[in-house]
Regions:
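Hydrophobic ligand-binding cavity/cleft-lining segments
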Residues: 1-47
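Terminal "cap-and-tail" regions of soluble proteins that handle hydrophobic small molecules
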Residues: 2, 9-12, 76, 101-112
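Short, surface-exposed coil-to-beta transition loops
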Residues: 5-7, 63-68, 91-96
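Functionally constrained cores in energy, signaling, and assembly domains
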Residues: 8-10, 26, 36-39, 55-56, ...
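Glycine-rich portal/gate segments that line the openings of hydrophobic small-molecule binding cavities
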Residues: 31, 40-88, 104-106
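Beta-strand/loop substructures that line and gate deep hydrophobic ligand-binding cavities in soluble
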Residues: 84-112
Length: 112
């Protein structure tokens, strides 16, 4: 049997370097992620060991369920960050965000 993996992705109309810089600017995640970020420990740019607290948003409404993201690693050479995410009801998942250049002007951002 062949396993199938489905992960969300986005094509961003910006060069890889710009997308990567935005991904490392954790205090601005709420500007592009469907979440309201409420805490960064330590504050500042993304660093391994940083813990972020957020509430999801749907249709412009902030949900009362909190999520915690634990930044595990930043791989600048491969443009990849790895998070352990504590979801409501005791669910934990590991997620990777990877930036892949398409050409000099666009970047694919792969989540999963």
């Amino acid at each position: 049997m062949t396993a199938v993996s489905v992960c969300p992705a986005a094509v961003v109309n910006a060069p890889l370097e710009r997308v990567w810089a935005v991904l490392l600017d954790s205090e601005h995640y709420g500007e592009w992620a469907d979440a309201r970020f409420t805490r960064f420990d330590p504050p500042g740019p993304a660093v391994p060991g940083q813990v972020m607290s957020a509430n999801g948003r749907e249709f412009g409404i902030t949900l009362p369920l909190q999520v915690r993201l634990h930044l595990q690693s930043i791989d600048s050479q491969n443009h990849r960050v790895i998070f352990d995410v504590d979801l409501p009801f005791g669910i934990r998942e590991r997620t990777t965000i990877r930036c892949i250049p398409i050409d000099g002007r666009t970047t694919r951002v792969q989540f999963g």
